[in-house]
Amino acid sequence: MLYFDWFDLPVSLYPDTSLLKQRFLSKSKLFHPDKFTLASEEEQAKALESSGFNNQAYKVLSDVDARIQYILDEYGLLKDDKEAMPPDFLMKMMVFNEAISDLEDDPSSFSTLQNDLVEWEHELKAELDYCASLLPLDKENARQLKTYFFKRKYYLRIQDNFSKFAQP
């Protein structure tokens, strides 16, 4: 069963979070293991399984990155964990990595690089918003979402490197 189906929500990059939480809490009460202490072992096991599924579904759908990965996986698009990235994007990565390593020698560029990362994050958000408008996914739209997903992974890695090496 799809996590979205579990909560009776449409597949979306931006599900209604208040409705998601409400349905999660409702199912949490319904399948709480304490309610099944006097039930048969089979019913207890089923309640425990349902409770675990409920928790996992909520955890995934509550986090945008996990949700995107889940959607792509459900569409069968992450079987090949490699994505050919556009050359201009790879060049951008190289420039960011070089700029981060240069911070040790030239800390004055910290704020410029920080601003560039914020701008990049805004670009990624706009790209995600565009991808959200494409659901349900066809082959071309799915490819765009997959490209976004891998760009986001690169971005998070760059941001992590920046935070490690770039203390003002």
Indicate residue ranges for each PLM-predicted region.
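C-terminal accessory/regulatory regions appended to core domains
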Residues: 1-168
